[in-house]
Amino acid sequence: MAGQSRPPHDRPEHLEPTMLPTTTFSPPFTITRASHVALAVTDLAASRDFYRDTIGLVVTEESDDAVYLRGLEEAAHHSLVLRRAEEAKALHIGLRVRTDADITAAERYFAGRGVDHERVEVPHQGPTLRFRDGVGTHIELTSSMETVPRKMAAFHEFTAGAPQRLDHYQVATHDVQTATDFWAGLGMRLSEYTAKDGTDELWGTWMEVKGNTHDLVFTNGRGPRLHHFAYTVPDATHLIHAADVAGATGFGEEIDRGPGRHGLSNALFLYLRDPDQHRIELFTTHYQFIDLEDDPIRWDVSDPRRAQQWGMPASRRWFFEASEFPGEPVRDPLLTATPATLEDYLSLH
């Protein structure tokens, strides 16, 4: 392959013993997928309009204080909740577990390990449990939701990017190793990872439970903060249409990155910022990761192809800005590896 001495997924022989986690394939409770995210927003109507008209999500229900939205193929009541607040925050990211018994098992597991957790009543959801993971990420588990009609065949209602379903989250954390170990212990499997050059020090990890490349991503940075949440779209033309609609609705300058193609996950992508600067990704074409003999793909942090296969790199704000969780201290990262940014690229050219 031109300009490349070995495939990016080959682990160099000179590296020290691996720091990669061992996945627990019989976890204490069963997580099935990324499910729903809740955001605190300062202008509820403006945020609703952005996600409905510029992104293309379906409004399931709204009140004076909250708006519930979903993708076109989703039967669950919501995958995005917007809540009116004085200050913009990422309230929590949600994961589904298989049954009500898994919520009880999670309570038992966290109690035995001193992990703070709370059973809560949440509108439109079944048994729900909130906790913080090993690096302070605010998590909500639920075993069920009210169901609504899928809109995937209502092609006359497709607008903007026509998002199909919520797929994953990316969280900036001060300690990628601790975060990765925590979730591997709960059954998540590493599909790809970025390491500090010449080492297996983890700079970023892509972890999955549903058989594609990621449900939950951790990257090195000040955290915990929610970098983005992501929805699949039908194809590449919908990414371009989403960009056109963003320009037409006054959000052209809020296109944060792309369109482009990641090396990690192989996805075509487009990132946008909402009126409170929360970041959403629309993407398509990632791959299956199911067979247990598949090893995780490794990338050097200095390799620009990991983040973008063509075009210029992302700006500093894409790498370093993210949404904080309420009341959660933000810590400086343990690693100092710094990705190449658009500003770095322009200074050299």
Segment roles from a protein language model:
Residues 47-52, 110, 136, 179-184, ...:
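Conserved active-site tyrosine of GNAT-family acetyltransferases
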Residues 9-27, 33-42, 85-174, 193, 202-207, ...:
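Vicinal oxygen chelate
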Residues 12-49, 53-108, 112-118, 323-349:
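The feature marks the first
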Residues 57-90, 137-146, 192-227, 233-236, ...:
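Conserved short beta-strand elements that form part of the metal-binding/catalytic scaffold
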Residues 29-76, 120-123, 130, 171-213:
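Core segments of cupin and vicinal oxygen chelate
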Residues 1-10:
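A cross-taxon signal for low-complexity, glycine/charged-rich
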Residues 161-253:
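Surface-exposed interaction/gating patches
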